[in-house]
Curated annotation (Swiss-Prot):
Positively regulates the transcription of the maltose regulon whose gene products are responsible for uptake and catabolism of malto-oligosaccharides. Specifically binds to the promoter region of its target genes, recognizing a short DNA motif called the MalT box. This is HTH-type transcriptional regulator MalT. It comes from Yersinia pestis. The lineage of its organism: Bacteria, Pseudomonadati, Pseudomonadota, Gammaproteobacteria, Enterobacterales. SMART domains: HTH_LUXR. ATP binds at residues 39-46.
Length: 903
């Protein structure tokens, strides 16, 4: 819950001086990116902007306190202020901020600006007391904010110090409206107005001017003069002499003498006790002071001018002026030192009763009351955890003495989950083992349910570490004892079980477990796990060869991301990457490339090492197009990321795929041999991850002419793929087997492997996997088409593959271009008939397409001409070549290509 007073405009006080000369300057605020009110405490910064804001619509106000140095808290309140200003226009940004589903503050602000791009009219955001921010990450994000905010948005910052926001650059570019101490100091006219409002006996103009000069227009000093002059035996002139030359850091003695000592003991105790609160309402005042009429007392003190401000129009929330608040807290520590822990304890109870555990934690920490801190955590820690309040939880758990933490095993479990969520994976088991040992030594009982929750977390750690057997045992044992009410641990254990089956190649068992995980996670709003389960389902379906079903599952995942605003999570990149893989398989290369590029964009706010697999996909897209130079650029980027980084074998396998294909296309045996000497050779190949690594190895062995070794590898891969029903892997393996057989002149076995690959492709939809094999694949497909040896579906796919090879690779159509024809006609062995009666350029193109296996209609579509025109071209070229039918034309084209060294 957000504290309403932090988002409320301060109420405009009745007896304040209207700063007309400054309001005129502020009237042009909409013309600037930043309006900065920068001066020491007590010069009326907040009051001035409150006066100006009273006439503004579409304005959000955010009052900072020390706790706002947590980036997540800062983001949540800032977006909430924008939402109040826009009437809820930025709902997506609000959801992201509340669930902490963004990579960093800059990424969140980028989404905010996207939503504000269609906001019409001026928009203002006021951030008060910015000097309290000491977090460099927030400063950096606000510099990003100022660079990229929409033109119609003005940021207004109130600060005692010059904020680290690139102010000089804004000033040079005339994008800064700045008001400082000299402008905010009262002039003589304003001082006269002030005293007329505050004193029962008016001062002469000359007297008020002298008083103003003596305190250099410092508003707080004038307020203190007015307050002191109400006391017996005091005068405005005496007060001014005491205040002359003082500043905010030397006021304590004066405030004691002239303010605190002048109120009765009851009011003094009331002020000091209330000072522990950063903001207060009647319920909190009752908790701290025992006064049932606390709000009336506040209103009375406000009338006396005691630096108390209303924070909202409903007059429910109050706060002290920052200068007075600092003074009161210092006096409270001095005068009520023994009572102070009790006051913070009462404040914590008050905030808990209002439903603000984060504020309660602040006071429990201030009180040093670890028992209360423990009680708050036991009641609210998991809610804070699921709302990603990780920094706050870490602060709490650090403050708890370890013996107290282990006396409450659920907090020890929370500490381990916190490490897991902060990606400190190596610490998780250590924390759990340390806690279990401490509990055992202290004879603290741990029931079966809690032990099962420990086991579920350990299972997650084990599967992350690549230990599926250990993970399976831990997850299975956990599920035996976890009741349905402990849904989070059950979701984790079920997910791990499904992932174990996936890793073992037991896809038929893995899929329903992941479907069950998704259902449970959706039911209990654990959307991160629901998304993870959908990603796993998609990968399983791809491995089973059901790419269309995988595509549809991905659509569900995209919908979940949109609904729950998960766009900035790394799992979104995972989804885009596997979408790219499916599209690449279907030779929808433009879409595949777009998905991979979006994945890279998602990861722009994370470590660049995470971009490895998307860059590898972009390399594969270039390879499928035959663009080797562009592919090499991406491959080099992948190699640079891999250098000096530690990656899981799955990542390395995917990054190596385009490398080995590139070596095959370029004949780079040196690089291939070097890689083969160094690459990891897994002990098994019983899942699609390991199949991919061994397939890379087999391809390199073929490149190097080590055919016997490659055949052993491929035979085992095919056997495992058939046994485990890894249909997509079998499809890929058979294509590599085809390459092996073709290069070793075993044409019958090559044809058999190719036909089975085409049959499997009816299920997988594979196109690009065939295309990257290039000319050898094209020759075999043409032969199968000419022999009419394929069923209709396979025939259609073969023609589509040929078309893509012709379009993207070194192919027959390209060979019959003008340069090729010029060389052909000057070749000494060219047939005399062709030399004396050369074909036109269009006829050469048609011959190339006939040789590539295209039908007349397909040639017409390819060249975008009428079918009758194609028949005319064919009749003419037959006559010029001296052939009678299509088969003879293909043979003649084959002879010409052989003569030129292309086949």
């Amino acid at each position: 819950m957000l504290i309403p007073s932090k988002l409320s405009r301060p109420v405009r006080l009745q007896n304040t001086v209207v700063r007309d000369r400054l309001l005129v300057k502020l009237s042009s605020a909409a013309n600037y990116r930043l309006t900065l009110i920068n001066c020491p405490a007590g010069y009326g910064k907040t009051t001035l902007i409150a006066q100006w804001a009273a006439d503004q619509s579409n304005l959000g106000w955010y009052s900072l306190d020390e706790s706002d140095n947590q980036s997540e808290r800062f983001a949540t309140y800032l977006i909430a202020a924008i939402q109040l200003a826009t009437g809820g226009h930025c709902s997506k940004s609000e959801a992201l901020s509340q669930k902490h589903q963004y990579a960093n503050l800059s990424a969140l602000f980028s989404q905010l600006f996207i939503e504000l791009s269609n906001w019409d009219g001026p928009l203002y955001l006021v951030i008060d007391d910015y000097h309290l921010i000491t977090n460099d990450a927030i400063h950096e994000a606000m510099r990003f904010f100022l660079r990229h905010q929409p033109e119609n948005l003005t940021l207004i910052i109130l600060s005692r110090t010059l904020p680290s926001l690139g102010i000089a650059n804004l000033r040079v570019r005339d994008q800064l409206l700045e008001l400082g101490m000299q402008q905010l100091a009262f002039n003589h006219h304003e001082a006269q107005q002030f005293f007329e409002c505050r004193l029962s006996s008016p001062l002469e103009q000359g007297d008020s001017s002298r008083l103003c000069d003596e305190v250099e227009g410092w508003v707080t000093a004038l307020q203190l003069i007015a307050l002191s002059s109400r006391q017996p035996n005091s005068s405005a002139q005496k007060s001014a002499k005491r205040l002359a030359g003082l500043n905010a850091s030397h006021l304590s003695d004066y405030l004691v003498d002239e303010v605190l000592d002048q109120v009765d003991s009851k009011a003094r105790a009331f002020l000091l006790r209330c000072s522990v609160l950063r903001s207060m309402n009647d319920a909190l005042i009752v908790r701290l002071t025992g006064e049932d009429n606390g709000q009336q007392l506040l209103e009375e003190l406000e009338r006396q001018g005691l630096f108390i401000h209303r924070m909202d129009d409903s007059a429910e929330w109050f706060c002290f002026h920052p200068l007075f608040a600092t003074f009161l807290r210092q006096r409270c520590q001095w005068e009520l030192a023994l009572e102070l822990p009790e006051l913070h304890h009462a404040a914590a109870e008050g905030w808990m009763a209002l439903g603000y555990p984060a504020e309660a934690i602040h006071h429990a920490l201030a009180a040093g009351d670890v028992g209360m801190l423990r009680d708050i955590l036991l009641q609210h820690a998991w809610s804070l955890f699921h709302h990603s309040e990780l920094a706050l939880l870490e602060q709490c758990l650090t403050a708890l003495p370890y013996p107290l933490l282990v006396q409450n095993p659920e907090l020890a479990l929370l500490q381990a989950w916190l490490a897991q969520s902060q990606h400190r994976y190596s610490e998780v088991n250590t924390l759990l083992e340390q806690a279990e040992l401490a509990m055992q030594e202290r004879k603290i009982p741990v029931d079966e349910i809690l032990r099962a929750e420990f086991g579920a977390l350990r299972a997650q750690v084990a599967i992350n570490a690549g230990k599926p057997d250990e993970a399976e045992k831990l997850a299975t044992d956990a599920l035996k004892y976890l009741p349905m009410a402990h849904y989070y641990s059950r979701i984790v254990a079920t997910s791990v079980t499904g992932e174990v089956h996936h890793c073992k190649g037991e896809l038929a068992r893995a899929l329903p477990m992941m479907q069950q995980t998704e259902q449970m996670a959706r039911r209990h709003e654990a959307y991160h796990y629901a998304l993870w389960a959908l990603l796993q389902q998609s990968e399983i379906l791809i491995a089973q060869g059901f790419l269309q079903a995988a595509y549809e599952t991905q659509e569900k995942a995209f919908e979940l991301i949109r609904e729950q605003h998960l766009e900035q999570l790394p799992m979104h990149e995972f989804l885009l990457r596997i979408r790219s893989q499916v599209l690449w398989s279907w030779s929808r290369l433009d879409e595949a490339e777009e998905a991979a590029r979006k994945g890279v964009e998602i990861l722009a706010n994370y470590q660049p090492q995470q971009q490895l697999q998307c860059l590898a996909m972009l390399a594969k897209c270039s390879l499928a197009r035959g663009d080797l130079d562009n592919a090499n650029v991406y491959i080099q980027r992948c190699e640079a990321l891999q250098h000096g980084s530690q990656y899981h074998l799955d990542w390395i396998t995917n990054a190596d795929k385009p490398r080995v294909i590139h070596w095959q296309m370029t004949g780079d045996k040196v690089a291939a041999a070097s890689w083969l000497r160094q690459t990891e050779k897994p002990g098994m190949a019983d899942n699609h991850f390991l199949q991919g690594q061994w397939r890379n190895i087999a391809r390199v062995q073929i490149i190097l002419g080590r055919f016997d070794e490659a055949e052993v590898v491929l035979d085992e891969l095919n056997e495992n793929a058939r046994r485990l029903r890894l249909t997509s892997d079998l499809n890929r393996n058979l294509l590599l087997s085809n390459t092996l057989y073709w290069q070793t002149e075993r044409k019958g076995e090559a044809q058999k492997a190719l036909i089975e690959s085409l049959t499997l492709a009816n299920r997988t939809g594979f196109i690009s996997h065939f295309v990257i094999e290039g000319e050898a694949m094209a020759q075999q497909l043409r032969q199968l088409i000419q022999l009419n040896a394929l069923p209709e579906l396979e025939q259609h796919r073969a023609q589509r593959i040929l078309k893509d090879i012709n379009q993207h690779h070194r192919h027959k159509f390209a060979h019959f271009d003008e340069i090729f024809v010029d060389k052909l006609l000057t070749h000494p062995q060219v047939p005399e008939l062709i030399r004396t009666s050369p074909l036109t350029q269009r006829e050469w193109q048609v011959l190339g397409l006939i040789y590539s296996g295209y039908s007349n209609d397909q040639i017409a579509n390819e060249l975008d001409v009428a079918a009758t025109t194609i028949k005319t071209h064919i009749r003419n070229l037959y006559q010029k070549l001296g052939v009678a039918h299509r088969q003879e034309a293909v043979q003649q084209a084959q002879r010409l290509l052989q003569m030129m060294g292309y086949v």
